[in-house]
Amino acid sequence: IAAPRVLDLCAGTGCLGLGIKRFCPAAQVTCVEKSPEAFVYLEKNCRCALKGQGGQTEDLLEPAAFEQEAAPAFDWGPALNALRAKAKPAYAVQPVEGDLFTYWQGLPEGQLDLIVSNPPYLTAEEMRHLQPEVAQEPAMALEAGKDGLVFYRALAEHYQNALRPGGALVLEIGWQQRQAVAALLAANGWADIECRKDFGGNDRCMISHRPEK
């Protein structure tokens, strides 16, 4: 597919979506994030990435890049500056402030080639025993209900129709969640379910597809 249509859910600051755009510049990528705090950085990263398209992406978290991107090249005058302030900014990847649990309701059927997501996946019990460095992260980015599966359940149940036949769903998972997530996908009719390991040898990525027929 020359220009795949990609949706990144629970995008955070845009690592997955921007990474896809980096390696496939023709991709049409939308990143969806619920957290207002994270969305600020998602917007900035998507805008800054314009400078680095075509395999030259700069450090997207470099504060100086934000300052340089935000500064006008010259004074357009009061009238034009006011219009520019209201204009929709240009993005390499389209950021959307939205909720994974409801965003599917507005998606047309069969229009996406790929959905990716690195959702929260810690259980309530795991949240009570976090390592100190992890405990500093926002709970919203970590917690996924009593069983750690609430996001995977929503993805498995509601997002298949948004993909074209044969389109792929790629999910990061916790190292102990392979069987549970695979079962959710199978129960909802996903095809060609497989798991990939990370460099540490742990189960880390579930891949599945909308059936061709």
Feature annotation, model-predicted:
Residues L100-T102, F199-G200, E212:
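Residue-level detector of flexible, active-site-proximal loop/helix-junction positions
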Residues Y121-V150:
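Mobile active-site "lid"/loop adjacent to the S-adenosyl-L-methionine
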Residues Y121, H209-E212:
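C-terminal beta-strand of the catalytic ATP-binding
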Residues R22, G106-L107, V134, N161, ...:
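Structural motif
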Residues K146-H209:
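Conserved Class I SAM-dependent methyltransferase catalytic core
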Residues N118, V134, L155:
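Conserved RecA-like P-loop NTPase ATPase core
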Residues I1-E62, F66, A70-S117, L122-M127:
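Conserved SAM/SAH cofactor-binding pocket of Class I
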